[in-house]
């Protein structure tokens, strides 16, 4: 490759080399590549570090440009939008004191002291934000020389000063300036404000400074912004759809679960909900059996000494429920892992036994502040479909492939697509040697490459004990949920001194994978309620078939049929009330019965039933034996869609 001495070569995401003039910035590269739409560059990663587009490039740099379709791009976009919000608030309420304003999963927020507003102020604030954006300020990053300089610059804001004092003395402090607004911030940010085309304030809330209930209550403003007005319109539509799918409302309406003040954050699963629950557990157990897992059950409460070995007592105690029995400290398990380590140690192991796949559907308890509890999504008591796989280092890639295949099979059954993220070694405070991390990361990456699914790399975002793969599933309205995880753990086998005998007779430390696919079964149940809008496929449904009688004389035949369907393994109900047929049909549809069978004089005479679906697809008279056979196939194959979804299939 020929080059002149005033140019340099950098590497793009696809590892191809690209020639740029010496002294170029990431923005120069973005301008040259001229990416458009959701791929238009908002920021960059250079050698794994996320930076502003103004960042200078050097010979050999590995450069990835982030657009709004990337999580990194959204984070940069929303972080800058938070600064626009703070600037607007200060223009309108000069005595307000900005504290922190981070991007979050959907948009951003900013917390303010000395500010009282209501929803009635939103229009005024949005108008001021639009005015600031129209000024199209270039955003400038400024390095602050010392902590004392930073304290001087923010001397009138005690919240910023508290943050500054919490940093280590050698930390590099930076500020960002747009017009008259200047904020203490590590960045990165947009190059200018012109990229922000649409925004909306969502709500206000109270928030304690730094999340500490002993500190001041601040005013938090939530908002969201987009580089395109249509994206905002689509997002607001998605919010309306999400309201219809709220699992808390549907859970009550369909009598699936409830939450009681007497047990905050600990769900009561009702009979109908337990039918769904049991099907989920039976399904995953079936999958585990086919993939050669064994299953164990470990105690719910174990001694302090165990949690000291695992590190939970020192690092996680504030999130544990602790009790004292006979002068000994016990903790209810917040995780299943330490119990599995004890099970592994209860036997001696040979390399011939490995890989050893051990599953547990364990009930764990974690303290969560009452204000953070939310339906089935954020609870204090939940079940995890955990598994720990013990193996030789040479097994890593093949075992990861096996877990990836298992997860793909399970998510596909529910009609859930997903994306994958590989998180690599953090810069500081990790255990294990460089070689161990290289082998572990190469194993995970090799498995992902072999699987052939697209994935993204989160540089430095792994756990201190090993790299990990996360599954982000997408539901029916395209919301993303982090569910499954595959974590390679180099810490617990060391802490518990786990061993196996190698072929040469030496005792060696196994490599361990921690994996979960549902994650929290309660949370996954909640996701499915919203994904299906309560309309569970037949195999999961707690309300499969309802018989409706036209008159009292039809009840004996309806109950005879109901018994046949129950004997065939279906959940059946008979409505023989005095309501009109149309009202009974409507009630059955609202209760989300998959199939509604009406019995009248003709059906009694012909020994048939009149079929319609919960979506009001009417099929008329059907033969009972044939219908049962079709439903058995639908249930056994765990079909997502009913063969009776359209009238043409009759």
UniProtKB/Swiss-Prot annotation:
Keywords linked to the UniProt accession: Aminoacyl-tRNA synthetase, ATP-binding, Cytoplasm, Ligase, Metal-binding, Nucleotide-binding, Protein biosynthesis, RNA-binding, tRNA-binding, Zinc
Subcellular location: Cytoplasm
Annotated InterPro entries: aa-tRNA-synt_IIb, aa-tRNA-synth_II, aa-tRNA-synth_II/BPL/LPL, Anticodon-bd, Anticodon-bd_dom_sf, Beta-grasp_dom_sf, TGS, TGS-like
A GO MF term: threonine-tRNA ligase activity
Keyword tRNA-binding: yes
Pfam family, one: tRNA_SAD
GO BP of this protein: threonyl-tRNA aminoacylation
Cofactor, free-text remark: Binds 1 zinc ion per subunit.
Residues reported to bind Zn(2+): 337, 388, 514
Needed co-factor(s): Zn(2+)
E.C. code: 6.1.1.3
Annotated Gene3D superfamilies: 3.10.20.30, 3.30.54.20, Anticodon-binding domain, Bira Bifunctional Protein, Domain 2, Threonyl-trna Synthetase, Chain A, domain 2
TGS domain sequence ranges: 5-67
Reactions listed under catalytic activity: tRNA(Thr) + L-threonine + ATP = L-threonyl-tRNA(Thr) + AMP + diphosphate + H(+)
Region (Catalytic) location: 246-537
Disulfide feature: none
GO CC annotations on file: cytoplasm
Enzyme class: ligase
Record text on subunit structure and interactions: Homodimer.
NCBIfam families per record: thrS
Family: Belongs to the class-II aminoacyl-tRNA synthetase family.
The protein's role, per its UniProt record: Catalyzes the attachment of threonine to tRNA(Thr) in a two-step reaction: L-threonine is first activated by ATP to form Thr-AMP and then transferred to the acceptor end of tRNA(Thr). Also edits incorrectly charged L-seryl-tRNA(Thr).
Name under which the protein is recorded: Threonine--tRNA ligase
């Amino acid at each position: 490759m020929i080059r002149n001495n005033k140019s340099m070569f950098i590497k793009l995401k696809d590892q191809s080399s690209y020639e740029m003039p010496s002294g170029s910035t990431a923005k120069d590269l973005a301008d040259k590549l001229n990416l458009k739409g959701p791929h238009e560059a908002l920021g960059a990663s250079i050698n794994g570090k996320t930076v502003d587009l103004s960042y200078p490039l050097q010979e050999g740099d590995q450069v990835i440009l982030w657009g709004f379709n990337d999580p990194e791009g959204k984070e940069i976009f929303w972080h800058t939008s938070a600064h626009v919000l703070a600037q607007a608030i200060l223009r309108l309420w000069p005595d307000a004191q900005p504290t922190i304003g981070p991007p979050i999963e959907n948009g951003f927020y900013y917390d303010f002291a000395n500010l009282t507003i209501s929803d009635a102020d939103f229009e005024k604030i949005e108008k001021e934000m639009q005015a600031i954006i129209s000024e199209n300020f270039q955003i400038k990053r400024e390095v602050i020389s010392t902590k004392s300089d930073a304290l001087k610059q923010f001397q009138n804001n005690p919240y910023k000063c508290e943050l500054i004092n919490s940093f280590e003395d050698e930390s590099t402090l930076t500020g960002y300036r747009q017009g008259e607004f200047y904020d203490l911030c590590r960045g990165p940010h947009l190059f200018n404000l012109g990229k922000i085309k649409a925004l909306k304030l969502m709500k206000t809330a109270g928030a304690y400074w730094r999340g500490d209930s002993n500190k001041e209550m601040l005013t938090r403003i939530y908002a969201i912004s987009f580089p395109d007005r249509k994206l905002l319109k689509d997002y607001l539509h998605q919010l309306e759809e999400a309201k219809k799918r709220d699992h808390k409302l549907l859970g009550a309406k369909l009598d699936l679960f409830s939450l009681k003040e007497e047990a905050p954050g600990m769900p009561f699963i009702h009979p109908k909900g337990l039918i769904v629950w049991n099907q989920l557990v039976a399904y995953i157990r079936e999958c585990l059996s086919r993939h050669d897992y064994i299953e164990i059950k470990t105690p719910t409460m174990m001694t302090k000494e165990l949690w000291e070995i695992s590190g939970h007592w020192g690092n996680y105690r504030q999130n544990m429920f602790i009790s004292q029995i006979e002068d000994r400290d016990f903790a209810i398990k917040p995780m299943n892992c330490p119990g599995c380590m004890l099970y592994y140690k209860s036997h001696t192991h040979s390399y011939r036994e490995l890989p050893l796949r051990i599953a547990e559907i364990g009930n764990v308890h974690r303290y969560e502040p009452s204000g953070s509890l939310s339906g089935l999504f954020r609870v204090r008591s939940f079940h995890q479909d955990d598994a720990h796989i013990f193996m030789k280092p040479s097994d890593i890639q093949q075992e990861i492939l096996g877990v990836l295949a298992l997860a793909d099979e399970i998510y596909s059954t529910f009609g859930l697509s997903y994306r994958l993220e590989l998180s690599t070694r953090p810069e500081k405070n990790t255990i294990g040697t460089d070689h161990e991390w290289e082998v572990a990361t190469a194993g995970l990456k090799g498995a992902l490459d072999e699987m052939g699914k697209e994935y993204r790399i989160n540089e430095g975002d792994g756990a201190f004990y090993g790299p990990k793969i996360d599954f982000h599933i997408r539901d029916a309205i395209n919301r993303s949920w982090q569910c499954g995880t595959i974590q390679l753990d180099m810490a617990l086998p060391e802490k518990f001194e786990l061993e196996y005998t190698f072929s040469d007779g030496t005792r060696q430390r196994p490599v361990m994978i921690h994996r979960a696919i549902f994650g929290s079964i309660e949370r996954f149940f909640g996701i499915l309620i919203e994904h299906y809008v309560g309309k569970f496929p037949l195999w999961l449904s707690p309300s499969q078939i309802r018989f409706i009688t036209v008159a009292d004389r039809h009840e004996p035949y309806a109950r005879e049929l109901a018994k046949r369907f129950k004997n065939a393994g279906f959940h059946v109900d008979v409505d023989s009330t005095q309501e009109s047929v149309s009202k009974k049909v409507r009630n059955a549809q609202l209760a989300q019965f998959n199939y509604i069978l009406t019995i009248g004089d003709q059906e009694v005479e012909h020994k048939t039933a009149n079929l319609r679906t919960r979506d009001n697809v009417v099929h008329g008279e059907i033969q009972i034996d044939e219908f049962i056979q079709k439903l058995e196939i639908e249930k056994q194959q765990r079909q997502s869609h009913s063969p009776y979804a359209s009238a043409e299939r009759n």
